[in-house]
Design a protein with these regions (language model features):
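Tryptophan-anchored aromatic micro-motifs
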Residues: 310-326, 359, 415
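Edge beta-strand at a domain terminus
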Residues: 353-363, 396-418
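Signal that preferentially marks extracellular ectodomain short beta-strand elements
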Residues: 46-73, 83-84, 154-178, 188-189, ...
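Structural beta-strand segments of beta-rich domains
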Residues: 12-16, 116-120, 222-226
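Flexible, low-complexity linkers/stalks enriched in Thr/Pro that connect modular domains
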Residues: 1, 82, 91-105, 196-208, ...
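Conserved structural position at the C-terminal beta-strand
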Residues: 78-80, 183-185, 289-291
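N-terminal glycine/threonine-rich, aromatic-flanked beta-hairpin/loop signature
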Residues: 321-370
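N-terminal helix-cap/turn-to-beta initiation motif at the start of protein domains
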Residues: 67, 172, 307-318, 329-331
């Protein structure tokens, strides 16, 4: 009576326990194959030694092991004959032998990654009685609840999570903490196992913030340097220039990527971007951001509006009159709005009658104001300027400031590459 293991159980040991109420003259126990994996050596029979024939509790722990087969199903028969020759039997039905630890593997997330969700992916090779995903904080923000233990339930203990998905009862992790993750479990025969450790996974559900402090709203912008501040390292990012007014632009939305050095957390007073190759002078844009961090959180929306782009004025600008062709040459300093000026007559590849001076642009007003101070003060000019396209300007000029674009002869200058 009182035998172990129990019927219909999975076991990881060959130990059989019993309780006998009288002395026996002989006894044996037998493992009879009933199903599962084939066992060509079955049945397995072992006679009890003399010290196991006494009344009371006994077990076979001191007897040699049998050559049982993993995942084979057996019926265990205990048989004993008392001193009067009476024979009794006890059957333990449907016992599955399994002394192998389950094979567990965590497949997702990946080590040294960042995630903004609680999806996991894992594999197991047999049904579990207990399964846990354990998150142990190893860096980042503190987590007073570490280690965080996720108990698997239902079908989660029986089948693989081949694709990343959220469990029935997701864990409560701390935003900004970095965890090592491990899968632990016990199968139905109580064999225990642990998986590989997924290291340094950052849980991050905070969206990055990118602040644009240059250019500002309702301003003009020239050059290629912008001023930005980034709250955290970015996986990728781009500045989005969208036409909202002014002259036409062949492309209404420009995505200008941020160079790698500007994807790091920090403040950048002069972040160089390839703007001048994309934007067009005289066009009014709004400036926003399209960026994401390493957990794929998209950046918080930001928009700077009513920015008028002014191209670099460096180079030669030609006005073709009825008889002659006039050329203006601008050599701006670092400000871009003032510098050296030269005008002359274009004769093929040469310039004659050169006159030199300095120039200053004021782009804060419309039309723009161009003041030229020549080495010969009698040649000083004040001009009103409008962009017609990226490479063409309309000019009205005089010794005094013209009242409007209609106050004098309108001349059209065209920029030509060297």
């Amino acid at each position: 009576t009182e035998v172990l293991p129990l019927a219909s159980s999975r076991i990881n040991t060959q130990t059989v326990e019993w309780n006998v109420d009288e002395s026996l003259q002989s006894g044996k126990y037998t493992w009879i194959h009933m199903g599962g994996v084939e066992d060509p050596s079955a049945p397995h029979e072992f006679n009890l030694s003399d010290d196991l024939l006494k009344p009371g509790k006994g077990d076979n722990s001191k007897l040699p092991p049998l050559n049982l087969v993993v995942d084979a199903m057996y019926r265990i028969t205990l048989e004993g004959t008392d001193l009067a020759g009476n024979t009794g039997k006890k059957f333990i039905m449907s016992v599955v032998y399994d002394d192998l630890a389950p094979q567990l593997e965590l497949k997702y997330p990946l080590s040294n990654s960042a995630v903004n969700h609680l999806d996991i992916s894992y594999s197991l090779n047999e049904q579990l009685s207990i399964g846990q995903i354990i998150y142990t904080r190893v860096g980042g923000e503190p987590d007073a609840n570490s280690p965080v233990i996720l108990d698997l339930t239902g079908a989660e203990l029986e089948t693989n999570f081949d694709t990343p998905q959220t469990t029935t009862k997701p864990p409560v992790l701390n935003d900004g903490s970095i965890y090592n993750i491990q899968f632990k479990g016990s199968d139905l025969a109580t064999n225990e196992s642990v998986s590989n450790i997924v290291e340094n996974v950052k849980y991050d559900i905070t969206r990055p913030v990118i602040t644009i402090f240059y250019p500002s709203t309702k301003s003009y912008f020239m050059g290629s340097d912008i001023g930005i501040e980034i709250s955290e390292d970015l996986k990728d990012g781009a500045m989005i220039w969208t036409r909202t007014g002014g002259l036409n632009d062949n492309v209404t939305r420009h995505s200008i990527p941020l160079y790698d050095q500007y994807l790091k957390q920090g403040r950048y007073e002069k972040a160089k971007t390839p703007i001048e190759k994309s934007l067009s002078a005289g066009v009014v844009y709004s400036l926003g951001v399209d960026a994401r961090d390493f957990a794929d959180n998209e950046a918080e929306p930001v928009l700077v509006e009513f920015i008028e782009f002014i191209r670099d004025m460096t180079g030669k600008w030609f006005y073709k009159g009825a008889i002659i062709e006039v050329v203006w040459v601008f050599e701006p300093d670092e400000s871009g709005v003032k510098g050296k000026f030269m005008q002359g007559l274009s004769l093929g590849t040469k310039i004659s009658d050169e006159e030199r001076g300095t120039f200053t642009f004021d782009f804060n007003k419309k039309p723009y104001l161009l003041t030229v101070e020549m080495d010969d003060p009698s040649k000083n000019r004040i001009s009103l300027v409008e962009f017609m396209s990226n490479n063409r300007i309309r000019v009205v000029t005089g010794q005094r400031k013209p009242a409007s674009m209609g106050d004098g002869e309108v001349m059209e200058y065209e920029w030509r590459p060297e």
